[in-house]
Amino acid sequence: MTDQRTAWGWGLASVDAAGNTLDVWYPELKLGEAPKEVARPNHNFGNLAHEGVDVRGVRRIPVFTVSKLDEPIEDAADAYLRLHLLSMRLAKPNTLNLDGIFAALNNVVWTNYGPFAVEDFALRKLDVMAAANQSAPGLPKADVNVLSIDKFPRMVDYVVPTGVRIGDADRVRLGAHLSEGTTVMHAGFVNFNAGTLGVSMVEGRVSQGVGGGNGS
């Protein structure tokens, strides 16, 4: 019987007013058995974390996540950890159990101000614009621009792998695996649990579960 594969790390979760996890960002992840609570390293999120809600209606909470990689996904924090593993090149496509990922992830409004809950987006957008105007009345402010409404965010907002070129960041999802030497052209698209395994140029769609070899 093989040992259970495990990964762990501190993440910064965005949680809406209803208690739903909108996203989790993991700056660093480790493979192997997680340390016991008394031996855990401290997170370094500082004042990025806040228990009170911001103008988006979102709290940002540090979460320590341990993922059993051969078992189905337990929750959103677990799902985000596995997506980060793929984009950080700590796991290759089709090597992680991703059962339950769609049920674990919430549909989110992804914007230039970060993630919003879908249900009260219009009202929260007004709150954000009003707060921006109060901070510097009379000056033009960036509108709340919706980038997508989806369960999966852009990879580059969470992980920026070395040695790659990406023509259009909107077309590479978190959970894409891009090896060193990969170029994703403007028309290319790379889904989660998909990508490249060597020096490659992506000019079309790389669907979930597909990996291109060196020189493809």
Please describe what each predicted stretch is:
Residues V159-S216:
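Structural signal for interior beta-strand "rungs" in well-ordered beta-sheet cores
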Residues M1-D157:
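Terminal amphipathic alpha-helical/low-complexity segments used for targeting or macromolecular assembly
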